[in-house]
Amino acid sequence: MSRFWNRRVRDLHPYVPGEQPKVADLLKLNTNESPHGPSPKVLAAIRDAASDDLRLYPDPTAAVLRDTIAARFGTTSDRVFVGNGSDEVLAHAFRALFHDDAPVLFSDVTYGFYPVYCGLFEQPFRHIPLNDDFAIDIDAYTGDCGGIIIANPNANTGIALPLEQIETLLKRHPDRTVIIDEAYVDFGAQSAIELTHRYDNLLVVQTLSKSYALAGLRVGFAIGSPELIEGLIRVKDSFNSYPLSRPAQAGAIAAIQDTDWLADITARVIASRDRLVPELQNLGFQVLPSCANFVLVHHPAHKAGAIAAALRERAILVRNLSTPRIQDWLRISIGTYEACIRLTDALRDILSPRS
């Protein structure tokens, strides 16, 4: 605690990211990164952008990237906002679109950045408990609120909501912004982007970090009504007018355009997930149904922390989260076929009875 910190900083509870240790032969299954590399077209575009033009500022409006996203998702560029990763996009959305005269609503088990944003921007919030089966209870999202954010598929559980339930929320709260955070949507859920033309209170946020295999590039985007997008732009231009570098914009354009690569690597992740789930169940784990690039698992006979520690001794990282309802669960990112074999072999050894 420093005497130089202001009150707001003293009261912050910052987000804690998954660890990124430098260990030889490390198998990282803790931060939901892609096990496959980005499109070769992306790498070529980034190399081409690394020219003498780096002496110049990038386009502050990222016009070509926004046009590319608009074309890809059947909308117009005035409905598209881009930022330095979806975390920045979400932060701007909390600041611009959520009101502080009533609590922001989100699940008790979800992305850990949501309460951090509320703390930073001094917005009240209320956790809405998941059902006993860890599904989002739409009927509980009632009453006055400052806005609503739903991760779909839900962060940490991987369970997805159907679009008709999202529509229920939009109709119930027509004068409040509803944000659907679709970081994992490409792994088996249905995007709500098609609803943005019918509901002016809907903002859909996606990232290139997961399914596009570009966590290191830091690009995210939002799609919504022009008035929502203008609110985000006002906040961006009051904070950082140039959030995306020239290489980032070039790489993101190539990634959005290479739909074949996206389809291939997401299909491979889904296939690995479908193989891993029964293997984990055969080892005694309860596995929640996942539409994401991870699974949330619980073993009734073994503590999650002990399993995570034993895996770490074998240079395998998984995430043992501190959220109260899932503190005895493990979130395991989906790796390659070979990575999943290494994981299950290690778990089999850890869980086997010792004589």
UniProtKB/Swiss-Prot annotation:
Cofactor: pyridoxal 5'-phosphate
Nucleus recorded as keyword: no
GO MF annotation terms: histidinol-phosphate transaminase activity; pyridoxal phosphate binding
Catalytic activity: L-histidinol phosphate + 2-oxoglutarate = 3-(imidazol-4-yl)-2-oxopropyl phosphate + L-glutamate
Key words, A-Z: Amino-acid biosynthesis, Aminotransferase, Histidine biosynthesis, Pyridoxal phosphate, Transferase
CDD domains: AAT_like
Functional pathway: Amino-acid biosynthesis; L-histidine biosynthesis; L-histidine from 5-phospho-alpha-D-ribose 1-diphosphate: step 7/9
UniProt keyword Mitochondrion present: no
Enzyme Commission number, as recorded: 2.6.1.9
Any GO BP: L-histidine biosynthetic process
Coiled coil: none
InterPro entries (alphabetical): Aminotrans_II_pyridoxalP_BS, Aminotransferase_I/II_large, HisP_aminotrans, HistidinolP_aminotransfase, PyrdxlP-dep_Trfase, PyrdxlP-dep_Trfase_major, PyrdxlP-dep_Trfase_small
UniProt modified residues of type N6-(pyridoxal phosphate)lysine: K210
Pfam families to which the protein is assigned, alphabetical: Aminotran_1_2
Subunit: Homodimer.
PANTHER family: HISTIDINOL-PHOSPHATE AMINOTRANSFERASE, HISTIDINOL-PHOSPHATE AMINOTRANSFERASE 2
Similarity annotation: Belongs to the class-II pyridoxal-phosphate-dependent aminotransferase family. Histidinol-phosphate aminotransferase subfamily.
Protein name as it appears in the record: Histidinol-phosphate aminotransferase 2
Species whose genome carries this gene: Gluconobacter oxydans (strain 621H) (Gluconobacter suboxydans)
Gene: hisC2
